[in-house]
Amino acid sequence: MEERPASEPQPQMDTSLKGVVGIQNMGNTCYCNSTLQLIRACPEWNAFCLTQNFTEQLRNVPDDNASKRILLAYQDIIKSVWSAYKPAYVRPLGFISEVRKAVRGTVYEMFGIPIPNDSHEYLVYLLDKFHEAIKTESVYTEIIVDDSANHIEKMRALAENGWNKFISKNKSEVVDRFFGMMRKTIHCTECKNNTYQWEVFNSLKIPCEGHTFQEWIKNEVKDSEIEGYDCENCTKLTPSNKVRHNAKIHTHIWKLPQSLFITLRRFNYDGRKNMSVCPYDGGSMNFTEFFAEESADSSRAWTYELRGVSDHHGSHMGGHYTAQFKHPISNEWWIMDDETAHKQVGPIAGVSNYIFYFRRKSS
C-alpha cells in the first residue's frame, strides 16, 4: 500500500457514494439481496445494530442460538456496506450460511436451498429471527374498564390490553420499529353484537385493485361478509337453538409503526402473478382515513415517505429481484441489482413493485 506524507492532502471520498454497495448473488439469492437492501434502508434499525445497547441485549443469549447468529451476521453486512463506497459489493457468505443452518428441518427449509424464493416470505422470516434474538418478556397487567365508561374509553382500553398482552411476551426493538396493529370488528347480523379482534402485523398486505394507491389500501380494509358465523352471543341468548348466521367484518388500522412495510398481493393462490401497474406516485403518504375513529394513537397523524422498494421482474414462472434504495445522506435513489448499483431520478412505479418500505417523516 502506498503511504502519503502527512503534509500531502488525502483524497476525499464522495459521501454520496458511501454505502452504495451491492450484495453478491450466491446462487439464486437475488430475493435475499433485495430483502437485505430493503431492511438496510431503515437508518434507525441499522444504527441500533451498531450500538452498545444492541451488544448488551445479546450478551446473555447463547452463542449457538440461531437467531443471534443470524442477527450478528446481518450486523456484519451492515458494517461492511456502510464502510465501503460504490462500486464495491459485499459477499454475504457468512449470513447465507447462518440462515441455511437455521432453516434445516423447519418450514423455512426452502431458504436453505439455492432456488428462487419469495422476498416477502424472506422479509417476514428475517424480522422474526431478529426479534427472537433480542426479545424480552414483562408482566401483563390488564386494564379493567369501568361499567360507566363510554364506548371510546372501552375501545381504547381493549386496544391497549391487546397490544400490551402481545408485547408482554414480545418486547423488542423490532416490534417497536416495525409492528403495527389492526382492529377487526365482527358484527353479527342476527343479534347485532360486535366482537373485536386485535391483530399485530409487520407488513401490511394490500390487493392490486383500484385506480390510486390509496384505493389499493382501501380495498384491503374494506368491509367483507362471512357466512355461517358461530356467534357466541347468539348461543348465550338461545342455547337450545344453536344456529349459525351471517356476519360483517369491518377492518381498521389502530396503530402503525415508524417503519412500515407494505406488500402488494402480486401472487395469486393459483400461482399466477398480478401484473397491474402500481399507481403510487412517489409522494408522501398519510393513512388517517384507514384508522378506526376511536383510535387516538399518535401514528394516526404521521406522514410517511418512501425509502425503499423490493421489485420482482418477470412472471410467476420465474424472474429476478432487485431493490430501489434512497440514500439516507444524499437522498438520491439507486437501483441495487445484486452486485451493481445504478442511479435513478426517483422511485420507479410499475408492474415489478412488490414491497414498499415507508418511513415516518420527521417533523
Q: What are these model-derived regions, one by one?
A:
Residues 1-18, 39, 52-53, 57-65, ...:
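Exposed substrate/partner-binding surface patches
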Residues 45-46, 185, 228, 333:
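Internal amphipathic alpha-helical segments of the cytochrome P450 catalytic fold
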Residues 24, 182-185, 224-228:
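Processing junctions and N-termini across compartments
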Residues 29, 185-187, 259, 322:
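Beta-sheet entry/capping signal
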Residues 109-211:
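A broadly conserved sequence feature marking short terminus-proximal activation segments
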Residues 2-150, 259-264, 344-352, 357-362:
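USP/UBP deubiquitinase core
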